[in-house]
A protein has these predicted regions:
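Long, contiguous binding/interaction regions
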Residues: 1-56, 64-93
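S-adenosyl-L-methionine
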Residues: 61
């Protein structure tokens, strides 16, 4: 298993945020990932509008996962309307 950092930007509405967080946690658990750390980075003003939103709520996850799971996450996260942007970065050991 490899170490990854994932940053997700959610729409700042609280009901969408709670629903999105539960979806992401379920997605990680269903694919056999271990969430090492979850950190709320808070609501921030975006540098440019994303899907007509000027603010976003940032969450940082540190996970351990197999590389093929990252592609599955990519497909699933693209379909979620409450997630504005996301990025997975492999961390060095």
């Amino acid at each position: 298993m490899r170490n990854y950092e994932a940053v997700l930007i959610f729409k700042p509405e609280s009901e969408l945020l709670a629903e999105g967080r539960e979806f992401v946690k379920g997605l990680f658990n269903d694919n056999g990932c271990k969430v090492v750390k979850e950190e709320e980075m808070g609501e921030r003003t975006l540098a440019y509008e994303i899907k007509k939103n000027s603010k976003g709520f940032y969450l940082l996850y540190q996970i351990e996962s197999e590389p093929e799971n990252i592609q599955a996450f990519d497909k699933a996260l693209k379909l979620r309307g409450e997630i504005l942007k996301y990025l997975f970065v492999r961390k060095e050991q």
